[in-house]
Every structure is written in structure tokens, then in C-alpha cells.
Amino acid sequence: AIFKVKFLTPDGERTIEVPDDKFILDAGEEAGLDLPYSCRAGACSSCTGKLLDGRVDQSEQSFLDDDQMAEGFVLTCVAYPAGDITIETHAEEKL
């Protein structure tokens, strides 16, 4: 399945189509978005985004706790879209 992912970045808003088997960070970079990252393995918080709408599958992440995930925080480097989503990027400082 292919879903619409709306990125809310410091540079503005952008919506792209992302298949359900592609990491959100990778898809955003391929679309030319300048997104933060470091480890690319779900083990740090550099790429953190805040999910404003929709659901993701980030079962491969190992950094966020259940409370942070319940608040909508997402590690974009290991998160797949599980439907149409809206995500605020550059959210590490809000953790």
C-alpha cells in the first residue's frame, strides 16, 4: 500500500507518497527534504518526529519509551507509515 505522508518542517509543509515498506526518513530524503538523523538504526533521538495524525509501525526502534510513543513521538529512521499520516519533523527538543 502507498500512503500520503505530510511533513511539517521548519521550511514549510510537504506531502509525499510513501509505500508501507519504506522508512519515513528515507522517503523524505529521496523527495529532497532536509531531515535530521544520526544513527539511522532507531537507537538515538536525532530523527525524532511528532505524529499529529495517523499511525506508524516503528517496532524496530529501541530508544523511545511507551509514554513517548503514546504522546506521538516517532523515530523516522525506523518508522513505516501505517496509513496516511501527518508528522512534525525536527522534534527531538520536545522529547
UniProtKB/Swiss-Prot annotation:
**Residue positions binding [2Fe-2S] cluster:** C39, C44, C47, C77
Q: How is the cofactor bound?
A: Binds 1 [2Fe-2S] cluster.
GO biological process: one example: electron transport chain
Residues annotated as transmembrane: none
- What coarse category fits the chief subcellular location reported for this protein? plastid
Q: Which residues form the 2Fe-2S ferredoxin-type domain?
A: 3-93
Keywords, sorted A to Z? 2Fe-2S, Chloroplast, Electron transport, Iron, Iron-sulfur, Metal-binding, Plastid, Transport
Q: Which InterPro entries match?
A: 2Fe-2S_ferredoxin-like_sf, 2Fe-2S_ferredoxin-type, 2Fe2S_fd_BS, Beta-grasp_dom_sf, Fd_pln
> Which SUPFAM superfamilies would you find in this protein's record?
2Fe-2S ferredoxin-like (SSF54292)
What Gene Ontology cellular component terms go with this record?
A: chloroplast stroma
Q: What does this protein do?
A: Ferredoxins are iron-sulfur proteins that transfer electrons in a wide variety of metabolic reactions.
Q: Which NCBIfam families match?
A: fdx_plant (TIGR02008)
Q: Can you say what this protein is called?
A: Ferredoxin
Q: Write down the species.
A: Gleichenia japonica
